[in-house]
């Protein structure tokens, strides 16, 4: 009996250590980075943290190979720049054959969804994909059906929350409607999803309600005590619930009030704005996850919600056009190490996730401002050059390195460039303004990182990154080829 008791206690301890993930919780795995972790390392990290659902932004062959046999549920994706091609049914069938059917075997990849585009109706795209998205969606789902996969793999379109809104005269969730300029396309999409028993996918970002809007009530972006907004007797105490239910009302208005909804992206960045930091991210997730863990839902959908957190890792090669925070959505740093306590079980415990194992780093070398430099007239131009080719978003207002002095700013910029260039000695010259040191030059909360050894499987290679930023640099400098 004592042996049995010990076995039971040991089992309970193991289960307690591993944790039980919030039902239906997944993560977005983006790969827009100059130095990527090996895909197999990332897959193991997901498994170590009991994350069993992952949403991709493509169907990269190396990534898919790493996912094979893992048992993880996978949402593969067709990027926006391929939507026009997918309006051809033959091309759609070929894509399904190469990226879905190919992995449909025991020990293959457990593909459950195909994301057709990513936020294709964003206003910033100026309508580029409005008339391509529905034909692409229909062709992909029909190709899945023809391949005999339609019951287990569903096509969906991840949409930004700007596809719906409430009128300024009645800004409450119950008045939610799809945007007038895309109501026709949205009705087509929703009707088609309904016929194929597929969900609609929406990306909700409470952080963006705060960003650049000092009039937005800060607490309303979180889950812990905002002044409620009343909508016909329903109190909304946070923008996530209000946003989600605005979609529910929009769906109801076009005859699909019961359509399943996936939250394709939701998260909080940790750098690049005064509200983007680890403390705020902890507060946000510590409010969101316990709600999901109890299947609390929202006032109009008071049940289970399928959610994919955004994102898994920081991505230093993403565009910062939306804002400097765009490279810092990860719950893990670029090297797979956790940033802040987060309890994916929804139990509200203050514990760190398990980081990536056996990550290879470059040597302990930094590039710093040369205090003996004489000609400082070229300093500003060299800092601009370094930041064009690397990620200096931590230097921005409200960010972790915002308090550095002029020399510190130069050192940070030079070091980020040096690391992106794999610590090549020629990348720490800057017309005599920089020098290499083996002393860690981090200051306070401002970390001067050492880059990881880039995965040989990286599809977004440093050389391709350099080509892109070189073109940008020439354009910024007004130079001609």
Curated annotation (Swiss-Prot):
Any idea which residues are catalytic in this one?
119 (proton donor), 265 (nucleophile)
Highest rank taxon of the organism = Eukaryota
Q: List the disulfide bonds.
A: 367-428
What UniProt keywords apply to this chain's record, in alphabetical order?
Cell membrane, Cell wall, Cell wall biogenesis/degradation, Disulfide bond, Glycoprotein, Glycosidase, GPI-anchor, Hydrolase, Lipoprotein, Membrane, Plant defense, Secreted, Signal
User: What is one process in the GO biological process aspect for this record?
Assistant: plant-type cell wall organization
Entry EC no(s):
3.2.1.39
Which GO MF terms does the UniProt record name? glucan endo-1,3-beta-D-glucosidase activity
Q: What is its main location?
A: secreted
Q: Which residues are glycosylated?
A: 99, 110, 126, 131, 409, 440
Lipid (GPI-anchor amidated serine) attached at which positions? 455
**Catalytic activity, per the record?**
Hydrolysis of (1->3)-beta-D-glucosidic linkages in (1->3)-beta-D-glucans
Q: Give the InterPro entries listed for this entry.
A: Glyco_hydro_17 (IPR000490), Glyco_hydro_17_plant (IPR044965), Glycoside_hydrolase_SF (IPR017853), X8 (IPR012946)
What's the protein name? Glucan endo-1,3-beta-glucosidase 8
Taxonomic lineage per UniProt?
Answer: Eukaryota, Viridiplantae, Streptophyta, Embryophyta, Tracheophyta
């Amino acid at each position: 009996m004592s042996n049995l008791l010990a076995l039971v206690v040991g089992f309970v301890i193991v289960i307690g250590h591993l944790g039980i993930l919030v039902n239906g919780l997944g993560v977005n795995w983006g790969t827009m980075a100059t130095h990527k972790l090996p895909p197999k390392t990332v897959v193991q990290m997901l498994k170590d943290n009991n994350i069993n659902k992952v949403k991709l932004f493509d169907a990269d062959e190396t990534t898919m190979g790493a996912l094979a046999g893992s048992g993880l549920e996978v949402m593969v994706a067709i990027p926006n720049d391929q939507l026009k091609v997918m309006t051809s049914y033959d091309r759609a069938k070929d894509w399904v054959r190469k990226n879905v059917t190919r992995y449909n075997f025991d020990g293959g990849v457990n593909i459950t969804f195909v994301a057709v585009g990513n936020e294709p109706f964003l206003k910033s795209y100026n309508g580029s994909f409005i008339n391509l998205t529905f034909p692409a969606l229909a062709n992909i789902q029909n190709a899945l059906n023809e391949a005999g996969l339609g019951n287990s793999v569903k096509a969906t379109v991840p949409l930004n929350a700007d596809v719906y809104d409430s009128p300024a005269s009645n800004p409450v969730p119950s008045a939610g409607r799809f945007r007038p300029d895309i109501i026709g396309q949205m009705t087509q999409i929703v009707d088609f999803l309904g016929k194929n028993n597929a969900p609609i996918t929406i990306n909700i970002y409470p952080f963006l309600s705060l960003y650049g809007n000092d009039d937005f009530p800060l607490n309303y972006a979180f889950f812990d005590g905002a002044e409620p907004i009343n909508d016909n007797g329903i109190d909304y105490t946070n923008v996530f619930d209000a946003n989600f239910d605005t979609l529910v009302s929009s769906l109801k208005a076009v005859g699909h009030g019961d359509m399943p909804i996936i939250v394709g992206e939701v998260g909080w960045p940790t750098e690049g704005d005064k509200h983007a930091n680890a403390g705020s991210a902890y507060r946000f997730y510590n409010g969101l996850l316990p709600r999901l863990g109890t299947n609390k839902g929202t006032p109009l959908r008071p049940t289970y919600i399928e959610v994919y957190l955004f994102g898994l890792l920081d991505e230093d090669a993403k565009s910062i056009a939306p804002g400097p925070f765009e490279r810092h959505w990860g719950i893990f740093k670029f090297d797979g190490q956790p940033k802040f306590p987060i309890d994916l079980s929804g139990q509200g415990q203050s514990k760190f996730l398990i980081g990536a194992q056996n990550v290879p780093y470059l040597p302990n070398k930094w590039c710093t401002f040369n205090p003996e430099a004489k000609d400082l007239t070229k300093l500003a131009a060299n800092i601009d050059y370094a930041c064009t080719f690397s990620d200096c978003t931590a230097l921005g207002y409200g960010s972790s390195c915002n308090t550095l002095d002029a020399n510190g700013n130069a050192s940070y910029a030079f070091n980020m460039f040096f690391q992106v260039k794999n610590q090549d000695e020629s990348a720490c010259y800057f017309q005599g303004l920089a020098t290499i040191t083996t002393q860690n030059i981090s200051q306070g909360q401002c970390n001067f990182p050492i880059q990881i050894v880039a995965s040989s499987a990286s599809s977004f290679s440093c050389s391709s990154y350099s080509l892109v930023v070189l073109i940008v640099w020439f354009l910024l400098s007004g130079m001609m080829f």
